[in-house]
C-alpha cells in the first residue's frame, strides 16, 4: 500500500526533512543567446546553474557568439567572466560585439587545474556567467610538472589518459561548487576533433565523454569556408566600392538538452566586416518569423502581418531593421 507524501516525510529524520520538498517550483533563469531561433529551441536561452557545451569547427564564431551573449548579460546587470586558454581574447573585438571590457573579469588558464581553481573561485564570488575558451587548449598539470625526457617515458603509460581523467574530475568539482552561492551559467567552448577510433571519420568535441555527460545543453556550430558559401558585400577602398567577403552563414544544431526538446537546428548570418558586426540578430529574427509562419513568403515577396509586401530577403531584413516597432512586434508574437 502506498503512503502519502506527508506520511513519508513524517517518518524521516527532522534534519533530513528540512532538505526535502516536492517537485513544484523548481525553475531556472535563462540567459538569451544572440540568436532568436536558438533561444526558441532552448526554451528561452541557456539555463543558469548548469554547464553548457558549445563546440564545432574553426571559424564558426563560437567565441564571438559567446561574447555577444556576455554583452546581453551585462546589459541585464549580470557579472561575467572569461577564462582564456587560447590567448585569443581581443579587447577591441569584444567591444565591437557590445562587451564592456571594464566590467568583464578576465583570467588566463594553462591547465585543467588552473581552470577549476579559477572557476570555483568565481562561482564562490557570485559571478553569474563564466565562459571557458577553450577546453581544447588545456592540458593536465602533469605535462607542466615533467621535463621533455620524462614526458617521452610517460607516452606509453596510463598518463596518456590524464586529460580525460582530469576533465572528468573538473566537471565534478565545478558542478559541486555551482549553486552554492548562486546559480552560475558555465559555458564551455570546444573545437571539433576527428574520432579516429570509429570505422568512419567523425567529429567530436574535446574532453572525453564526461564533458557531454555533465552538460545540460550541447550545441554544435559549423560553417563552410568555401567561397560560394561566403556572404559578400561592398567594402569602400579609397574612392571605390569593392566586393569582398564580409561574413558567412553559421549553422547550429541543438544536439542535446535537458531543459528543452533537443535535436533542433537552424542557421544565422555572421558578419566580421561591414556596417554590422557579429551575429545578425535582425536577419535571424526574420528567418525565425518565416519558419514559424508568422511571415508568409510567396516567391521573392514577403508578406507582413499587416498585409504589407516587401521584395527579397535583404529588403525585408532592412525594412525590419529600420522599424523598431515591427521588430518588437515580431519578437512578442514569437515568444
Task: Give the positions of each predicted feature.
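Conserved inter-motif catalytic segment of the P-loop NTP-binding fold
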Residues: 57, 68, 76-169, 173
Amino acid at each position: 500500500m502506498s503512503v502519502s507524501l506527508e506520511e513519508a516525510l513524517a517518518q524521516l529524520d527532522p534534519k533530513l526533512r528540512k532538505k526535502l520538498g516536492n517537485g513544484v517550483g523548481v525553475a531556472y533563469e535563462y540567459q538569451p543567446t544572440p540568436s532568436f531561433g536558438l533561444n526558441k529551441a532552448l526554451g528561452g536561452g541557456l539555463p543558469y546553474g548548469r554547464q553548457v557545451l558549445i563546440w564545432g569547427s574553426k571559424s564558426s564564431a563560437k567565441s564571438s557568439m559567446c561574447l555577444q551573449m556576455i554583452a546581453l548579460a551585462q546589459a541585464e546587470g549580470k557579472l561575467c567572466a572569461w577564462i582564456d586558454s587560447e590567448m585569443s581574447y581581443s579587447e577591441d573585438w569584444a567591444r565591437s560585439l557590445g562587451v564592456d571590457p571594464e566590467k568583464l573579469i578576465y583570467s588566463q588558464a594553462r591547465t585543467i587545474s588552473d581552470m577549476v581553481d579559477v572557476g570555483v573561485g568565481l562561482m564562490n564570488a557570485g559571478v553569474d556567467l563564466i565562459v571557458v575558451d577553450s577546453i581544447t587548449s588545456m592540458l593536465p598539470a602533469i605535462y607542466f610538472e615533467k621535463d621533455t625526457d620524462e614526458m617521452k617515458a610517460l607516452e606509453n603509460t596510463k598518463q596518456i589518459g590524464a586529460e580525460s581523467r582530469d576533465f572528468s574530475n573538473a566537471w565534478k568539482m565545478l558542478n559541486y561548487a555551482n549553486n552554492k552561492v548562486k546559480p552560475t551559467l558555465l559555458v564551455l567552448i570546444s573545437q571539433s576533433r576527428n574520432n579516429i577510433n570509429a570505422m568512419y571519420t567523425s567529429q567530436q568535441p574535446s574532453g572525453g565523454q564526461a564533458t557531454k555527460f555533465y552538460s545540460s545543453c550541447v550545441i554544435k556550430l559549423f560553417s563552410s569556408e568555401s567561397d560560394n558559401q561566403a556572404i559578400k558585400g561592398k567594402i569602400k577602398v579609397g574612392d571605390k566600392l569593392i566586393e569582398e567577403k564580409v561574413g558567412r552563414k553559421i549553422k547550429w544544431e541543438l544536439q542535446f538538452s535537458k531543459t528543452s526538446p533537443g535535436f533542433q537546428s537552424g542557421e544565422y548570418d555572421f558578419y566580421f566586416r561591414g556596417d554590422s558586426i557579429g551575429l545578425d540578430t535582425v536577419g535571424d529574427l526574420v528567418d525565425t518569423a518565416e519558419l514559424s509562419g508568422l511571415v508568409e513568403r510567396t516567391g521573392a515577396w514577403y508578406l507582413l502581418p499587416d498585409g504589407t509586401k516587401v521584395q527579397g530577403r535583404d529588403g525585408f531584413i532592412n525594412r525590419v531593421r529600420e522599424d523598431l516597432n515591427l521588430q518588437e512586434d515580431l519578437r512578442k508574437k514569437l515568444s
